[in-house]
């Protein structure tokens, strides 16, 4: 069976197009709704916090049944259905419960789809970045489109746009075929805990938790931060889009990069550049040129680090535990890390100021760099051969 390149790419396009409505503008929508920074941080923490449980639960079911794509379809449907509740919610209580319900299903989707994509690619995992880049294209389309839209329309229109994108994400899952070699392994998890207990794997997860803690102030407050410095919604959208465009360029050349560089090297460089990026954003907001440079660094801080992580999980956990491995990566990094980062940035944004919050993000990346340098992938310097 040939790889359904455009259908896989289409899912990434619509999934990350949805994210392009969330990340830059959801905090603005909440602020417009009367929520303060602490409440915005808490709601953002709930949004990512369900990743701690949801991906692992769905990953366990997927590996047990061998029906990853069916789970993706069910979760995508309920995510779209529950999100429509935001069209009617009016207070913190309802926003919190709808956020939990919607995100429990939405956060289940991507880790399973990563596994489905890699199963389709079989012995060609280096092609992953060429498929994944369409997610970045989708993100850019919506972040620019919504930015222009919000210069002329109230931000209250945002939930309608996101709901439509969620429906499209669900629709495209219906036309994607199962991979030929996706099979059920039954309830046994032989070797799973043995893998997790390896010092290198524990260090890998710790590094990614710290990396996502550092990203939280950017995801939650960057647009509010730019608005405070009097940047328009269009400029804000362009800056977000620039970061993802840089990510696309990296994805285009990632196949060659994976053949020339170890995953360890890609991860270490990404962490080092992330440290500098958060310092630039925190201390140089008045200088548009430096903000542009910081956004270009998104290619490494998210794109490079994520591709390295996806491939390391693939190598660590093997075929039998792919669903659970990708889910564990998602839940610990984007879930636990994102939740902790959202909470700390929300509580300290007004108390200590934006410079302090972004400086602590840089410290988090610095610690992650040291851990990765000491423990991650030191004994497997030739892993590029498996990827090229």
Regions found by a protein language model. Give the residues of each.
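Helix-loop boundary and gating motifs at the non-cytosolic
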Residues: 2-48, 201-239
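Juxtamembrane intracellular "pre-TM" segments in multi-pass secondary transporters
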Residues: 1-2, 175-208
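Hydrophobic core of transmembrane alpha-helices in multi-pass small-molecule transporters
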Residues: 13, 82-83, 92-110, 209, ...
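Symmetry-related core transmembrane helices of the 12-TM Major Facilitator Superfamily/SLC fold
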Residues: 157-174, 356-374
């Amino acid at each position: 069976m040939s790889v359904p390149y455009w259908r896989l790419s289409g899912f990434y396009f619509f999934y990350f197009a949805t994210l392009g409505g969330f990340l830059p503008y959801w905090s603005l929508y909440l602020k417009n709704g009367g929520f303060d920074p602490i409440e915005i941080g808490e709601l953002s923490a709930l949004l990512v916090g369900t990743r701690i449980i949801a991906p692992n639960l769905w990953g366990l079911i997927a590996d047990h049944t061998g029906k990853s794509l069916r789970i993706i379809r069910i979760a995508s449907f309920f995510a779209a259905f529950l999100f429509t509740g935001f069209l009617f919610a009016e207070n913190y209580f309802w926003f919190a419960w709808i956020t939990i319900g919607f995100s429990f299903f939405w956060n289940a989707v991507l880790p399973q789809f990563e596994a489905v994509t890699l199963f389709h690619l079989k012995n060609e995992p280096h092609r992953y970045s060429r498929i994944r880049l369409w997610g970045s294209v989708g993100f850019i389309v919506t972040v620019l489109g919504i930015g222009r839209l919000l210069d002329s329309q109230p931000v209250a229109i945002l939930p309608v746009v996101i709901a439509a994108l969620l429906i499209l994400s669900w629709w495209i899952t219906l036309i994607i075929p199962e991979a030929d070699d996706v099979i059920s392994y039954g309830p046994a998890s032989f070797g799973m805990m043995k893998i997790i207990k390896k010092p290198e794997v524990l260090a890998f997860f710790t590094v990614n938790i710290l990396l996502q803690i550092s990203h939280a102030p950017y995801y939650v407050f960057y647009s509010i931060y730019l608005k405070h410095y009097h940047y328009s919604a269009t400029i804000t959208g362009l800056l977000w889009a620039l970061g993802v465009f840089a990510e696309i360029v990296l994805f285009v050349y990632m196949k060659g990069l994976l053949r020339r560089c170890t995953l360890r090297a890609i991860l270490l460089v990404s962490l080092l550049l992330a440290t500098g990026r958060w310092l630039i954003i925190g201390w140089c907001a008045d200088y548009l040129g430096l903000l542009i440079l910081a956004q270009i660094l998104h290619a490494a801080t998210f794109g490079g680090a994520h591709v390295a992580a996806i491939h390391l999980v693939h190598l660590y956990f093997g075929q039998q535990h792919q669903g659970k491995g990708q889910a564990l990566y998602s839940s610990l990094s984007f879930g636990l890390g994102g939740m902790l980062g959202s909470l700390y940035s929300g509580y300290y944004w007004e108390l200590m100021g934006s410079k302090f919050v972004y400086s602590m993000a840089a410290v988090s990346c610095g610690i992650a760099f040291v851990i990765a340098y000491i423990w991650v992938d030191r004994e497997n310097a030739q892993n590029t051969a498996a990827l090229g």
